[in-house]
Structures are given as C-alpha cells and as structure tokens.
A protein has these predicted regions:
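An anion/pyrophosphate-binding glycine-rich loop and adjacent beta-alpha core
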Residues: 148, 154-266, 318, 327-332
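Glycine-/small-residue-rich beta->alpha transition segments that form the dinucleotide
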Residues: 118-120, 124-129, 298-299
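Conserved redox-cofactor binding core of oxidoreductases
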Residues: 30-112, 117, 124, 168-172
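FAD-site-proximal beta/loop scaffold in flavoenzymes
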Residues: 92-110, 114-115, 259-301
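Glycine- and aromatic-enriched mobile tails/lids
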Residues: 28, 34-55, 192-208, 219-222, ...
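Glycine-rich active-site loop/strand segments that organize a redox cofactor
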Residues: 1-18
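Alpha-helix capping and helix-loop boundary segments enriched in small/acidic/polar residues
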Residues: 63, 109, 113, 132-140, ...
C-alpha cells in the first residue's frame, strides 16, 4: 500500500525497513505508557484510512499523535541527561567546511542569542503548513529546520510534493483548520456534493477510500466545476454512539460550531497537511552535511515517495529517531566541538522590525501559495509566483541587515525560503505523479 501510494518514488529498502522495525517501536511506545484503543477481546481496535487495503492502524480515539507525544514527553522528562529548553528558537545552524557544530538559539523571553555547540545536531522541526495558511498544521509549522539546513547547503529533495488532507472542516467563522480524520471515511462516512452525489467513484474504484492525493484532487475538480466552497462528509447513517466513542474530539468540535453529525453533513475541503519531501537523509538520518541529522516531517527519507500513505508519518518518525540514536550511540565520543570557537551573534540594530510589515508579507505569501501553488498547478502561475517570492526573499535579506532579530521575522524568512524551494521544485517537475499535478503537463507517471 505504501509503494502504491508513493507512485514509483518510494525507496523500497526504506519501506521494508520501516515496516519491519515498526512493531518493535510500537511495543516500546506501549512500554512507555502510550495507550491505544482495544476491542472487547483486548486486541487492538485497528482502524482503516485512505489508501489502506486493510484495517491496520493502531489509534487512540481521534488523537493518536497527541497520545504518542504525551507518552514520549513523559518519558523524556524522566531522563536526567535530557534538558528541554522551552521558549527557545533556533535561528541558524553553525557550520564550517560542510560540518555542523550546533546552532545559534534565541531565548524568546530575554531576546538573548546563545551558541548551542554540539558534536551532532538533529533537526526534528516538523512541517511547513503555515506557508499555505489554510492548513491542518499548528502555528509553529513554519519550515524552520528545512530553511536552516538549506542555508548551510544541505540537500533538499522533492519539496514539490505537498500533501493536502482532503477533509479539513470548512467553517467561515474560524481561521484555524480542524482535521476530520480519514478514519471517519474508513468507519463508513461518505463524501457528497452539495446536491448529494457520491462523486468519488467517478475518480477511483476505491471510492471514498482512495488515497489522499486522489481524493483531494477529485474534490478540487468538483469544486471548480460547481463553484461551491466545500463538499460534505455524510455520517448520518452511522451509529452515533459508536461514532462518539471512536471520534470524541471530532464530534465535540463539530457540535461546538452547530453541526449535529447525527442529522447534518459535515462541510469539508482540502487543506495543506503534510510535506512528503524535505531534507534528504540516508537510513541513519544523516544529511549531506556532516554531523547534521534530520527526522520526521522535515526530512525526506524515501518512505513516502510522491504521496504519503495515511498514518505512515508517525511510524516513520519513531523508526528513524531510533535508528539515529542507535547510530550515534555506536560512535566514539570525540567531543570535537570543544576545541572550536565560534563568534557570538551580532545584531545589526537594537530596533525591531515593524510587526505590521511581517504580518502583511506573511499573509500575502499564504494567499499566493494557496492560489498559485495549491493542489493543481500550472507553469505560468508558478513562474509568476517564483518572481514574487524571490522579491520578498530579497526584501527579507535587506530587513535583516537593518533590524534586530525577532522570532516572528525569522519565521517569515524561513517560510519564504521554503516557498522558494517548493515553487522551484514544481517548475522543474514535468510529470504528474502522486500528490503533484500540473494541468499543462502532458506526461504522467503511468504514460511510459
């Protein structure tokens, strides 16, 4: 299923490695206290999502990621040799001769910038959703790790493969986007147009359970045909008691904005959800820069290919973080950085940049990305977008020379750099594959 979803761009060796190692990492999570739903017989209550041929997804109600994070953080806090710096923001990686030696880090509360030197540095900075604005990602998903790595010439790959989750809750009165899990369709929910047509069978034999790229592209086509602002997820035929047991957060969130799932369809539309590309790494998480590692959504491991299979990201993060640890633990402790002396960070000015400039440019970027570099792209839009983003990038470089560093400005700078990587990759790719589609592209992955 992973290979099919990845549409020919998965690294088969990586796929086999993750699938083989996955059960051990799951057991480790459970040993650390993660609790996953079980059926009446005490076995895992396995869910099914788009692209999966079987029920195989271990979950915790409709908050699996939260439960995994809770268990890992609790375990981390138990370790005396782990120190967590809250309210600290990494600005730049420290590098010399293609080798990373740590990072310059901003204390958000004191505005002090410190040098965090390290023999090895691991980026686990998550996704890039805020580049689009209309996203299921949190506000901190500004692509910081990818941008920092790019600035020290680490190789990035396949940044054009942006996964749009097909069913984010549509609601005009809210700026944040709430995710309606694909497991709801696996549970039996139907996608419908405003007129009630179940349209997915027109696009894929798997219907509502097709992979995310196909469902998102199909919804995009339907909305452009009809002029409607959303489609609908129909759960009115499902057992409401069973639904609330499986999806309590989805039920309560819909109810809070006046949607009665038992009687009403849920308005949904695609939103940016996941970056399938990222910082290129090998099977030990090593980047092209010595002593720099990357893991999770900011990395490109070869697992997802052109499109991620639902729920594979959590598995990937667990397997690769463990492999990075095992690799580093096998190396002799040389403490190379102690002999190195790096200059302190110097701000060009004591004055902060006008926040309205940052907010305006960020909003303009998000509108541009949504409009010109969305689910379906074309070269004329991409070339126009590239020109504008390059202009903003040059403006950011000039601003940095004149003003004091702030987290908000650096997030904007990182978002613009990531947007450039996405648009360049989109222009260079000349075939439709997985989650990538250009309407003026005649060649497809299956046309060879």
């Amino acid at each position: 299923d992973t290979l099919i979803c990845g549409d020919g761009l998965c690294n088969k060796e990586v796929v086999e490695m993750v699938v083989t190692d996955g059960p051990k990492r799951l057991k480790e999570l459970i040993d650390w206290g993660a609790k996953f739903d079980q059926n009446n017989e005490g076995a895992f209550d396995l869910g099914r999502e788009g692209g999966h041929s079987n029920n195989r997804i271990v979950h915790h109600k409709d908050q699996t990621g939260y439960e995994i994070e809770r268990a890992i953080l609790k375990q981390a806090h138990r370790q005396n040799n782990i120190k967590i710096f809250d309210f600290h923001f990494a600005l730049e990686l420290i590098s010399e001769n293609n080798c990373c030696y740590g990072a310059y880090v901003l204390n958000e509360k004191t505005s002090e910038i410190s040098i965090f030197q390290a023999d090895f540095t691991l980026l686990a900075t998550g996704g890039i959703g805020q580049v689009y604005g209309h996203t299921t990602n949190p506000s901190i998903a500004t692509g910081d790790g990818i941008a920092m790595a790019n600035r020290i010439m680490a190789t990035t790959k396949e940044m054009e493969f942006i996964q749009f989750h097909p069913t984010a809750l549509y609601n005009k009165s809210f700026t944040s986007t709430f995710l309606i899990s694909e497991a709801v369709r696996g549970f039996g929910g139907y996608l419908r147009t405003k007129d009630g047509e179940r349209f997915m069978m027109n696009y894929d034999k798997r219907g509502d359970l097709a992979s995310r790229d196909i469902v998102s592209q199909s919804i995009d086509i339907e909305l452009k045909k009809s002029g409607d602002e959303c489609v609908y997820l129909d759960c009115t035929h499902l057992n409401i008691l069973s639904f609330t047991q499986h999806f309590p957060l989805i039920y309560s969130s819909c109810k809070a904005i006046g949607i009665d799932i038992e009687k009403q369809w849920i308005p949904v539309l695609p939103a940016q959800h996941y970056l399938c590309g990222g910082i290129s790494v090998n099977t030990n998480g090593q980047t092209s820069v010595n002593n720099l590692f990357a893991c999770g959504e900011c990395s490109r491991t070869g697992l997802h290919g052109a499109n991620r299979l639902a729920s594979n990201s959590l598995l990937e993060a667990l397997v690769f973080s463990n492999r990075i640890y095992n690799y580093l633990a096998s190396l002799p402790l040389l403490e190379r950085t102690k002999s190195k002396v790096f200059p302190k960070w110097k701000d060009c000015n004591s004055e902060n940049v006008d926040q309205t400039i940052v907010i305006k440019m960020k909003t303009q970027l998000q509108i541009l990305m949504q409009k010109k570099i969305g689910i379906v792209r074309n070269d004329s839009d991409l070339i126009e977008a590239k020109k504008q983003i390059e202009s903003w990038n040059a403006e950011c470089i000039n601003i940095q020379k004149k003003y004091r560093v702030t987290k908000e400005f650096y997030e904007l700078r990182n978002m613009i750099e990531v947007a450039l990587l996405i648009v360049r990759g989109s222009i260079e790719r000349n075939e439709n594959r997985g989650g990538f589609m250009k309407v003026n592209t005649l060649k497809t992955a299956n046309s060879d």
